[in-house]
């Protein structure tokens, strides 16, 4: 049904839900029927229609950049996080549509506080919420559909929306075209159904005034033409031919209407008689099958007891073997743990041994290798050569020093003789 066409919601479904939830403080909870599990799909479809009436696509989805939910969005689990966010967003928007200020929840808000605020607003409208708040955390289920449906109804009441009765279109029957010679006059009965609160019966009234006027005109014409009718000028053969030609057109065929309740009643009686006749034949077979199944189940039960009694000692042995197996497994686990520890220690010792071997090999190779001795000999030879060169240089230096000292001594002696000779000459003169 389109969103613009407002119809009356089925009150029986709403009553069934309220009875199933146990509305009221002292009202006892009524046992739910087999179709109660699928009732939330109906509530979800009604909720989508109510949201369309509230223009949620233009005012909410486009502004918040959200995709429209499907007709069973909150009835089936798809993505709990996304469904819970969509539920909180719709609930906040519906509460704002009722004229009350409610802050739009964000993703980082506490979900428990958000649910508590929504339920408190729902209870302020006089609605009951006798289910745990954790049912709304999943974002889907009967409780989620119930809360959103109640808020949508309150929003419709606030904007002054009223439900109207549905208007059914009148179906026009197609007229059949038949040949002129073999034509039959077909009268189709069109029933116009008017929904009234006082009565459900339908009556057809005949306009007696019209019939009376037609009869009066016929009597007047007959009285005016009495003189012409006194003498007949019609040929009997032509009259018979005309009667044979017009007779097929005078046949009236009443077309059966599938909407007629009498046809459905007849069908119900036929089905009832068929079911009763079939039940008489099948009841014996079903009783026989039931008895055979009961006897078979009794035999199976007795056989199970006999087998259990016969195999009781084997079961005890099996249990003992299971206990021994568990003990052996525990011992194996303990031994396996010790082996693992010893394997680790062995790997550490092996690693240290490899290191010692490597060091010994390095030292042995260094001891047996003659390269260092050759280098030492070469160094000693070089040192000797350098020592000889130093000795030669020292001798040259000593010789040079000795020559310089001797030369200096000679010079001093000569100077001394030169100084003594003039003094003696002066004394001589």
UniProtKB/Swiss-Prot annotation:
- GO annotations of cellular component type: axoneme; centrosome; ciliary basal body; ciliary base; cilium; dendrite terminus; Golgi apparatus; intraciliary transport particle B
**Matches recorded under Pfam families:** IFT57
Q: Where, per UniProt, does this protein localize?
A: Cell projection, Cilium; Cytoplasm, Cytoskeleton, Cilium basal body; Golgi apparatus
Q: Which segments of the protein form a coiled coil according to its record?
A: 305-369
Keyword hit for Mitochondrion: no
Q: Which domain of life is it from?
A: Eukaryota
Give me the ranges of the annotated region pDED: 335-426
**What tissues has this protein been observed in?**
Present in retina and testis. In brain, it is present in the cortex, striatum, globus pallidus, hypothalamus and cerebellum. Present at high level in neurons and neuropil throughout the brain (at protein level). Expressed in hippocampal neurons, where it colocalizes with HOMER1 at postsynaptic regions.
Its Gene Ontology biological processes?
apoptotic process; cilium assembly; heart looping; intraciliary anterograde transport; intraciliary transport; keratinocyte proliferation; left/right pattern formation; motile cilium assembly
Keywords tagged on the record: Apoptosis, Cell projection, Cilium, Coiled coil, Cytoplasm, Cytoskeleton, DNA-binding, Golgi apparatus, Transcription, Transcription regulation
Listed GO molecular functions? DNA binding
What does gene deletion cause?
Mice show randomization of the embryo turning process and heart looping, which are hallmarks of defective left-right (LR) axis patterning. Motile monocilia normally present at the surface of the embryonic node, and proposed to initiate the break in LR symmetry, are absent. Furthermore, defects in central nervous system development are observed. The Sonic hedgehog (Shh) pathway is down-regulated in the neural tube, resulting in failure to establish ventral neural cell fate.
Family the UniProt entry places it in:
Belongs to the IFT57 family.
Q: What does this protein do?
A: Required for the formation of cilia. Plays an indirect role in sonic hedgehog signaling, cilia being required for all activity of the hedgehog pathway. Has pro-apoptotic function via its interaction with HIP1, leading to recruit caspase-8 (CASP8) and trigger apoptosis. Has the ability to bind DNA sequence motif 5'-AAAGACATG-3' present in the promoter of caspase genes such as CASP1, CASP8 and CASP10, suggesting that it may act as a transcription regulator; however the relevance of such function remains unclear.
Q: How does this polypeptide assemble, per the annotation?
A: Component of the IFT complex B, at least composed of IFT20, IFT22, IFT25, IFT27, IFT46, IFT52, TRAF3IP1/IFT54, IFT57, IFT74, IFT80, IFT81, and IFT88. Interacts with IFT20. Interacts with IFT88. Interacts with IFT80, IFT-81, IFT74, IFT172, IFT70B and KIF17. Interacts with BLOC1S2. Interacts with RYBP. Interacts with HOMER1; the interaction possibly prevents the pro-apoptotic effects of IFT57. Interacts with HIP1. In normal conditions, it poorly interacts with HIP1, HIP1 being strongly associated with HTT.
Identify the PANTHER family for this entry: IFT57/HIPPI (PTHR16011), INTRAFLAGELLAR TRANSPORT PROTEIN 57 HOMOLOG (PTHR16011:SF0)
Q: What is known of its domains?
A: The pseudo DED region (pDED) mediates the interaction with HIP1.
- UniProt protein name: Intraflagellar transport protein 57 homolog
């Amino acid at each position: 049904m389109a969103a613009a066409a407002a119809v009356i919601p089925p009150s029986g479904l709403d009553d069934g839900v309220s009875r199933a939830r146990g509305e009221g403080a002292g009202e006892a909870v009524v046992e739910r029927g087999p179709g109660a599990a699928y009732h939330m799909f109906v509530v979800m479809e009604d909720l989508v229609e109510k949201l369309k009436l509230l223009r949620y696509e233009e005012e909410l989805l486009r502004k918040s950049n959200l995709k429209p939910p499907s007709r069973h969005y909150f009835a089936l689990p798809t993505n709990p996080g996304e469904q819970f966010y969509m539920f909180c967003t719709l609930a906040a928007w519906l509460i704002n549509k009722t004229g009350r200020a409610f802050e739009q929840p964000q993703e980082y808000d506490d979900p428990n506080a958000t649910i508590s605020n929504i339920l408190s607003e729902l209870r302020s409208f006089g609605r009951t919420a006798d289910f745990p708040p954790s049912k709304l955390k999943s974002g889907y289920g009967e409780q989620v559909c119930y809360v959103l449906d109640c808020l949508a109804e309150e929003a419709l009441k606030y904007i002054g929306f009223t439900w109207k009765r549905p208007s059914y279109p009148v179906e026009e029957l197609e007229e059949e075209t038949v040949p002129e010679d073999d034509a039959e006059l077909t009268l189709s009965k069109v029933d116009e159904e008017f929904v009234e609160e006082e009565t459900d019966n339908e009556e057809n009234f005949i306009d007696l005034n019209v019939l009376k006027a037609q009869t009066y005109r016929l009597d007047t014409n007959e009285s005016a033409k009495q003189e012409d009718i006194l003498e007949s000028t019609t040929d009997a053969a032509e009259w018979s031919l005309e009667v044979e030609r017009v007779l097929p057109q005078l046949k009236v065929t009443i077309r059966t209407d599938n909407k007629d309740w009498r046809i459905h009643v007849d069908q119900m009686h036929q089905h009832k008689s068929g079911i009763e006749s079939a039940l008489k034949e099948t009841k014996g077979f079903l009783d026989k099958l039931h008895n055979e199944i009961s006897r078979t189940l009794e035999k199976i039960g007795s056989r199970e007891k006999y087998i259990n009694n016969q195999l009781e000692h084997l079961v005890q042995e099996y249990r003992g073997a299971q206990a021994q197996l568990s003990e052996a497994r525990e011992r194996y686990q303990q031994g396996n743990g010790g082996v693992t520890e010893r394997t680790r220690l062995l790997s550490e010792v092996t690693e240290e041994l490899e290191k010692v071997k490597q060091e010994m090999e390095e030292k042995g190779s260094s001891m047996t290798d003659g390269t260092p001795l050759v280098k030492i000999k070469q160094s000693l030879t070089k040192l000797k050569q350098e020592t000889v060169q130093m000795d030669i240089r020292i001798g040259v230096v000593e010789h040079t020093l000795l020559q310089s000292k001797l030369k200096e001594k000679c010079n001093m002696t000569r100077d001394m003789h030169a100084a003594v000779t003039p003094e003696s000459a002066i004394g001589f003169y």
